[in-house]
């Protein structure tokens, strides 16, 4: 089962981890992590060296989402097998 893990670059030591995070494609913007789950659910969270805090989640596309989300000019582009979705990201 996929694990979300923060690793200290200089030492390779794990700082924290989240078990059973799930299969996803991730995008980091500042301290916000956007994770498009394989189920089509979008998870927004904050990441710091101290840990992960989930902010929200929403089903935005169908299952089978395997493409990398793209963020440009305050818009998030996400696709699944059948559609392309554009969301405003504040």
Put a short name on every predicted segment.
Residues 1-90:
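Noncatalytic, solvent-exposed loop/strand surfaces
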